[in-house]
């Protein structure tokens, strides 16, 4: 299936940006954005195999960012966004409770945007049998800006994240689960100055009432 889409969006400044805290600015204007997409998807083998490609272009103006005016920090409609790129994904339901999936995205930013990686690759798998289910995935991130204008640009080195989840459905009301995140204990930041947790494991109970 081939699809094309053009959309226009805007975001009004929230009360916090207009009137609260030291960087407030009651004169902020709405952010404006245009988005263009062209996508193609295909299913094979009775729907057990699927894959697709998506091309996009995004242009935005009056983006609200922190700046300086009269010697103080203040929020301003000073930033622009102009991004284009491509995304691809594929999935395969193998059978016997097994399935695998993968996706990749490439992003080109004319004006760097924090927390938006240029390259993102993911591969994962799932297995379910009876009351048990297990899923795992590995994600590679590269070209991630953790800070951008008006701050000095900071670009994170590439890193790999591995997550794992398992669950047991005890009965129709109770499910026990355990989850591990960043099991390779990578050191990385999404926003400059805020390190993300290293290897973390936790579990719990889920009630279905």
What function would you assign to each model-found segment?
Residues 38-42, 88-92, 123-127, 136, ...:
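Residues on the lipid-exposed face of transmembrane beta-strands in outer-membrane beta-barrel proteins
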Residues 59-61, 95, 140-149, 155, ...:
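C-terminal beta-signal and adjacent terminal beta-strands/loops
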Residues 1-2:
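Transmembrane-helix signature of polytopic, membrane-embedded enzymes
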Residues 25, 35, 54, 76-78, ...:
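Asparagine-centered polar/low-complexity signal
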Residues 5-61, 67-93, 113-118, 155-157:
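Outer-membrane beta-barrel signature, preferentially recognizing the C-terminal barrel domain
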Residues 50-60, 76-148, 173-175, 184:
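Gram-negative outer-membrane beta-barrel transporters
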């Amino acid at each position: 299936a081939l699809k094309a889409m053009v959309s226009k969006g805007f975001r009004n400044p929230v009360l916090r940006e207009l009137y609260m805290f030291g960087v407030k600015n009651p004169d902020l204007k709405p952010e404006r954005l245009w988005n263009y997409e062209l996508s193609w998807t295909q299913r094979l083998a009775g729907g057990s195999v699927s894959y697709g490609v998506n091309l996009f272009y995004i242009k935005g103006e009056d983006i609200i960012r922190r700046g300086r005016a009269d010697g103080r920090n203040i929020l301003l409609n000073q930033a622009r966004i102009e991004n284009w790129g491509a995304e691809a994904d594929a999935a395969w339901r193998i059978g016997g409770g097994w399935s695998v999936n993968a996706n990749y995205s490439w992003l080109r930013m004319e004006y760097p945007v924090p927390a938006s990686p240029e390259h993102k690759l993911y591969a994962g798998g799932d297995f379910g049998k009876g009351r048990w289910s297990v899923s795992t995935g590995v994600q590679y991130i590269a070209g991630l800006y953790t800070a951008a204008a008006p701050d000095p640009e900071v670009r994170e080195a590439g890193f790999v994240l591995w997550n794992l989840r398992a669950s047991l459905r005890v009965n129709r009301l109770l499910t026990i689960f355990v989850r591990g995140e960043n099991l390779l204990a990578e050191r990385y930041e999404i926003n400059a100055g805020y390190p993300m947790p290293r290897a973390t494991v936790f579990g719990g109970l889920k009630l279905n009432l």
